[in-house]
Curated annotation (Swiss-Prot):
Membrane as UniProt keyword: yes
EC number: 7.1.1.-
Any Gene Ontology CC annotation: plasma membrane-derived thylakoid membrane
Membrane-spanning ranges: 6-26, 36-56, 87-107, 115-135, 136-156, 169-189, 210-230, 244-264, 275-295, 312-332, 333-353, 376-396, 419-439, 490-510
InterPro entries hit by this protein: NADH_Q_OxRdtase_chain4, NADH_Q_OxRdtase_chainM/4, NADH_UbQ_OxRdtase, ND/Mrp_TM
Mode of membrane association: Multi-pass membrane protein
The protein's name: NAD(P)H-quinone oxidoreductase chain 4 2
Database matches in Pfam families: Proton_antipo_M (PF00361)
Entry-linked HAMAP family: NDH1_NuoM
Keyword ATP-binding on entry: no
Amino acid sequence: MMETQFPWLTTIVLLPLLAALLIPFIPDQNGKTMRWYGLGVGAIDFALMCYVFWKYYNASDSGFQLVEKYLWLPQIGLSWAVSVDGLSMPLVLLAGLVTTLSIFAAWQVDYKPRLFYFLMLVLYSAQIGVFVAQDLMLLFIMWELELVPVYLLISIWGGKKRRYAATKFLLYTAAASIFILVAALGMALYGEGNTTFDMVELGLKDYPLAFELLLYLGLLITFGVKLAVFPLHTWLPDAHGEASAPVSMILAGVLLKMGGYGLIRLNLEMLSDAHVYFAPVLAILGVVNIVYGGLNSFGQSNMKRRLAYSSVAHMGFVLLGIASFTDLGISGALLQMISHGLIAAVLFFLAGVTYDRLHTLALDEMGGLGQVMPKIFALFTISAMASLALPGMSGFASELMVFVGVTSSDIYSSTFCTVTVFLAAVGLILTPIYLLSMLRQMFYSTGKAPVCLLKNTPYENEVLDEAICFGTNCVLPAKAVYTDAKPREVAIAACFLVLIIGIGLYPKIATRMYDAKIVAVNTQVRQSYTFAKADPQLFAKGFLFPRIPESEVLSVSGLLR
């Protein structure tokens, strides 16, 4: 572990939260001060992350770095313990970038701007807190803290069915998160010695297999809900369909990744013995997500719901990579999380930009937009190409790594690998179908002209006024001219697309941050398999074929046991 004297991570986590508490005392009449304040806080925090990781993070070290630990409630073993490693550091940067740009995207918020930016900054802190928490109870607290601002952001600034969507999101995620609390208490209280929630110490305990399997199942439900794993995904299309564009950017770009992070951090790394038996289940769920998400996406006429089901499909590759038992597959899963975070964020942002002009998300009411909005057309097309894994884009690199990782796995039988890869490839073929179909409906076909009728509007006779709409607060002239993307909107999209193309052309930009950690985690998982392969239990015998040479597995049993 690498420790520093100055509490950098604590500062990064608490800065947005403390800044949010000052919002009620800042004078602001028209909301302009609030938006600059929110953007400034987000940008400063993101810049601080970049500085700290550039100066202090060692990519070749697989252990925890920048460790800070302060006793909070010593009577029950609870402490403020934060750190980063290869699993969390890239996701912290992703959360900082997406949240900062989502604040910049919410430039037109004029309804309760103080509350809006307060919630966005609280959400900022909670997200970072989840990724850097080294104390399992602290992770649970941050996980729960994140639910409140998301619920309010959807229910106040969402669409017509915003309360239904927000309530459904809250019920799903809050109910599932109980398993984190149960697992934390169970792991902390197991065995002799002092009670602790420190993840490092909990990971070193030797749990009975039955107990570990129960823990794994409970956490799989928790993280499966957040990752939108079938059949726990139904909250996602409703939430995206009703949330405003900046909130959808965070939902797809960051919150889904919390589920994938939890699976790797807790299920894969800390409960590796149980992972041996659940890995085939994850692989099957991954294939189901890919095919089911693709088929449902094609059937959606609402643009944001189509993108939401696309996210369900892409998260299937994360499950496949985690289940692969290979360095390449797990690395591809993490790269897929980073890649999808960038791609989904820019797609939902552009969906919001389009909605601002048309005041509709119905694809059959669009058409011919390519001529009147060429910049939006170009940005949308590039983003869609990235989502369908065009070579040279980050999605291609991550999905290829997952495919090769699963194919080259020496744990599964050749039949299981072949069927899994074939079905995933079938699902992959669906991606260009529903994305190119969406582009055709939006930018090429004639469609039906959007009808915008607002009574008592002062703009009825003004032809050149721009159509503006954010959430439930619309100023939409009846004869509005639908303008192309503004410089601010182009800049936001460009920030994402530069990274998407950069990672696609040179994936090492991202993978070098976590390669060492992935090797260490997978070595531990494969070692757990060697303990289990002599006596395959439960359903694993039908899927696993023991063919790991003993010489390939490092002897780390002393560290594990």
